[in-house]
Structure formats: structure tokens, C-alpha cells
């Protein structure tokens, strides 16, 4: 079985590229089915396994396939599928892609789950996102034995690393960085009005950090008004005035807000240049801070050219969250050591799994030989032959049949193959214990 991780992340590509490769969560199962069919069409034997992890900072395809030439086939087929599915020219995607086979794929999965490959070193949100990706693949019926085992081991390693190191102790989250960036423009958050667009985990986390500064008021604009109202109610319970808006209300109310934080799964921008220009006129060009945590982006990038708008993307926040790196270095080294050991364990498991078909074939062949000799012995006993002679003949027959294949291979081999067999056969037939004396 061959493993492969092919992807793109914040290390290899800017947000302008990453947003073109990101998958809409609503269509992820459909994409997984399409990927499997594409891999099947690439001359794969058996059913390929697949999982897609798509977040604001990375899009990764994890694959497993049972084929002697699977490594090259998996890379070519998966890259071709990704480029075609996201309607990108291969030449524009290739410079940003990484392709990790076998143990490199395992190591990468472990590092991602532990937060070692994140923009925020040690952050925990990625682990939940990986679990969601695995759940989606399982629901789609494309997870399979090998990837399921890989991710179960991945989650166990992440738990071990977080429990035995201080990997997340000194990290600064995206939410905290959003507050700090806003405070560069507005000294007191308590005097500002804040708009959150979206109501998912990221916005909920951001709201927690901003609400701690007791802003003047807060509004939640979300696709489903009920979810937005739930978040608004939880904010109101903290003595901060909050309300829920429909997305359709944004053009008429955008000018009311000083700080706007957005993180949705929309495939198209929610806030356009014209909408912001109109809002600035109504504000008489009072500054606005806009923080875009979405991939694909929720704000049209042209907005950044406006003089009175401070637009930040996830890549911009990356500069702030690098603080604390030196303090985390010892924990990172400890985590890497744990991961390296667990990679070896998983690869040993994979090698054992690869031997299962051979073991089953040998066991089935042994059973056929046993049954054949047993039937012959039973017939002789039915004829009244001497039981001692029958037992001796059955034992001799089993011995000859079990040794025939190995001796035949040795006698008809030469060169390096013969040398290898001479070293191997004694190990195969070595006794594991001395016979007991009776």
C-alpha cells in the first residue's frame, strides 16, 4: 500500500493562490467521490482511499492506493485532478505544491495535527478541522483501512504531544492577533462598534477576545439568522450590546461599524469595493479596520487601496503570531522527537499490513496440503491399514509438500537470488523452541 499527501499551504503559497484551491465544505463529499473515480481511472488496483483537508491556511489531499507503481501514479493523478477540479493551469499550481510519499506523508499528518505546521505554532483548531475532514471522508465511504488507521494514530500522537509538552503555551491565536491589529488603529476597543460576518468557530473565538475589551456594541451578520442570534445572545449575556443582522442588510449598515471581522465559507467575496466606498462617504472617511480570516477571501482585495481602510488577511496576521517562537522552541523539539518515534511505529504497522495477504496465502496453502494428506490417511485407515504406517506416511507427505517449494526455488536459483535464499531459508525453518523430552 502506498501513501501520499499532496497539498498547498501558507508556507508555499499566498492567500491569493490558496483561495483558488480551497474546497467548499458543502461539496466536499462530492469532491471525494470524484477524486476516487479519477484515481480508479488512473489504473489503480483496488479502491483508493482519500481524505481532503481544506482550511484557510492549507488544502491537502491524503491518498492511499494498493498498486506497485502507486507512488508516481498517485502524484500525477492527484495533481491532475486538483488542477482540473479547481480550474487552474498546472503551471500556475505546480510551484506551490508539495508531494509527500509514505513516511513523509505520515510525519506531515502528525506535525499538522500537533500544530507544528500551523501559522500559529501549537494552535489546537487544526486538530478539530482534521477530525471534521476524516468524518466527512468516512461519511462519503472513501476513508478506508489505511487512512483510518493513519488518522486515528495522528489524533493519538496529537493528544500525546499536547499532554507531554508545552507546545501551545506561548502561542498567539488568530483571534488575539486580530484584536492587537485593531488596537494599532483604534487605541480603545471599548469606544468602537464591531461587526462580525459569519458565526462559525473562528468568529466565535474572535468575538470572545473582542468582547473582553467591552466594545460599544456588536453585530453578527450571518447566512442563517438563527445562528447569528445565538452568538449575539451569548455576547449580550456578557453586558455588551449585541444584535443579529441579515447579510442583505450589510450594504445599508456597513458604515456604522469601525471594526469588521469576517470568516465565512463563501466562495465569492461578501464585501465589495463599491460597498466600502459608499460606507466611507457616509462615515466622512473615518478609518475602518477590516480583518479577513476567510479563504477564499470575504473582502475584495481592491479594498486595500482605499486610504481610510486598513484591510488585513490571514497572511498579514502571520507576522504578529510569530512572537513567542524562542519560548516554544524547546517544546517543538520535544514534539518532533515524539513524532519521529511514532512515525517509525506506524510504518512498522504498515509493513505488517502489507504482509497480511502473503500470510493468508501461505496459511490457505498449508490448510489445503493438510486436508489432502488427512483425506489420504483417512482412506487408508478405512481400508484397515496399520495406523502407525498411516501416520508415518501422512507426516512424510506433509514434510515433503511443505519443503518442496523452498527446495525447488533453491535448486533452480543462481547468483544473488541463490545467495539470498541461502541466508533466508534457515531463518524460515528455524525452530523457535527446543522439543521437550518425554
From Swiss-Prot:
Protein known as: Glutamyl-tRNA reductase
Remaining remarks: During catalysis, the active site Cys acts as a nucleophile attacking the alpha-carbonyl group of tRNA-bound glutamate with the formation of a thioester intermediate between enzyme and glutamate, and the concomitant release of tRNA(Glu). The thioester intermediate is finally reduced by direct hydride transfer from NADPH, to form the product GSA.
Substrates-to-products reaction catalysed: (S)-4-amino-5-oxopentanoate + tRNA(Glu) + NADP(+) = L-glutamyl-tRNA(Glu) + NADPH + H(+)
Annotated gene: hemA
Positions contributing to NADP(+) binding: 198-203
Pathway: Porphyrin-containing compound metabolism; protoporphyrin-IX biosynthesis; 5-aminolevulinate from L-glutamyl-tRNA(Glu): step 1/2
Stored CDD domains: NAD_bind_Glutamyl_tRNA_reduct (cd05213)
Catalytic machinery residues: 56 (nucleophile)
Gene3D superfamilies reported for this sequence: Glutamyl-tRNA reductase, N-terminal domain, NAD(P)-binding Rossmann-like Domain
Gene Ontology biological-process annotations: protoporphyrinogen IX biosynthetic process from glutamate
UniProt organism field: Polynucleobacter asymbioticus (strain DSM 18221 / CIP 109841 / QLW-P1DMWA-1) (Polynucleobacter necessarius subsp. asymbioticus)
Disulfide bonds: none
Amino acid at each position: 500500500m502506498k501513501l501520499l499527501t499532496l497539498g498547498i499551504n501558507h508556507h508555499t503559497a499566498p492567500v491569493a493562490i490558496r483561495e483558488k484551491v480551497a474546497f467548499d465544505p458543502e461539496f466536499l463529499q462530492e469532491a471525494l467521490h470524484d477524486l476516487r473515480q479519477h484515481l480508479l481511472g488512473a489504473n489503480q488496483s483496488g479502491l483508493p482511499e482519500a481524505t481532503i483537508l481544506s482550511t484557510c491556511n492549507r488544502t491537502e489531499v491524503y491518498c492511499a492506493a494498493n498498486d506497485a507503481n502507486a507512488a508516481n501514479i498517485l502524484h500525477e493523478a492527484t495533481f491532475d485532478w486538483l488542477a482540473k477540479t479547481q480550474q487552474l493551469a498546472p503551471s500556475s499550481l505546480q510551484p506551490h505544491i508539495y508531494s509527500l510519499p509514505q513516511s513523509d506523508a505520515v510525519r506531515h499528518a502528525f506535525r499538522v495535527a500537533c500544530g507544528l505546521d500551523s501559522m500559529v505554532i501549537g494552535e489546537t483548531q487544526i486538530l478539530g478541522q482534521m477530525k471534521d475532514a476524516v468524518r466527512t471522508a468516512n461519511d462519503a465511504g472513501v476513508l478506508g483501512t489505511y487512512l483510518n488507521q493513519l488518522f486515528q494514530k495522528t489524533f493519538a500522537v496529537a493528544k500525546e504531544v499536547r499532554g507531554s509538552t508545552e507546545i501551545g503555551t506561548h502561542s498567539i491565536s488568530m483571534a488575539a492577533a486580530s484584536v492587537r491589529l485593531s488596537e494599532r488603529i483604534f487605541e480603545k476597543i471599548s469606544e468602537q462598534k464591531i461587526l462580525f460576518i459569519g458565526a462559525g468557530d473562528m468568529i466565535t473565538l474572535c468575538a470572545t477576545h473582542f468582547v473582553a475589551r467591552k466594545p460599544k456594541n456588536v453585530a453578527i451578520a450571518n447566512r442563517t439568522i438563527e445562528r447569528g442570534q445565538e452568538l449575539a445572545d451569548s455576547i449580550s449575556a456578557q453586558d455588551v450590546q449585541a444584535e443579529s443582522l441579515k447579510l442583505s442588510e450589510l450594504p445599508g449598515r456597513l458604515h456604522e461599524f469601525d471594526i469588521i471581522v469576517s470568516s465565512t465559507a463563501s466562495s465569492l467575496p461578501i464585501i465589495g469595493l463599491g460597498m466600502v466606498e459608499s460606507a466611507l462617504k457616509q462615515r466622512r472617511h473615518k478609518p475602518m479596520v477590516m480583518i479577513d480570516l476567510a479563504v477564499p477571501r470575504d473582502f475584495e482585495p481592491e479594498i486595500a487601496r482605499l486610504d481610510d481602510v486598513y484591510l488585513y488577511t490571514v497572511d498579514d496576521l502571520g507576522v504578529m503570531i510569530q512572537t513567542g517562537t524562542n519560548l516554544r522552541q524547546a517544546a517543538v523539539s520535544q514534539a518532533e522527537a515524539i513524532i519521529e518515534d511514532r512515525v517509525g511505529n506506524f510504518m512498522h504497522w504498515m509493513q505488517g499490513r502489507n504482509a497480511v495477504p502473503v500470510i493468508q496465502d501461505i496459511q490457505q496453502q498449508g490448510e489445503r496440503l493438510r486436508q489432502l494428506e488427512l483425506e489420504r490417511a483417512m482412506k487408508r485407515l478405512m481400508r484397515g491399514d496399520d495406523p502407525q504406517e498411516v501416520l508415518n506416511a501422512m507426516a512424510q507427505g506433509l514434510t515433503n509438500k511443505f519443503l518442496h517449494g523452498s527446495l525447488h526455488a533453491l535448486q533452480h536459483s543462481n547468483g544473488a537470488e541463490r545467495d539470498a535464499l541461502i541466508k533466508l531459508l534457515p531463518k524460515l525453518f528455524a525452530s523457535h523452541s527446543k522439543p521437550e523430552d518425554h
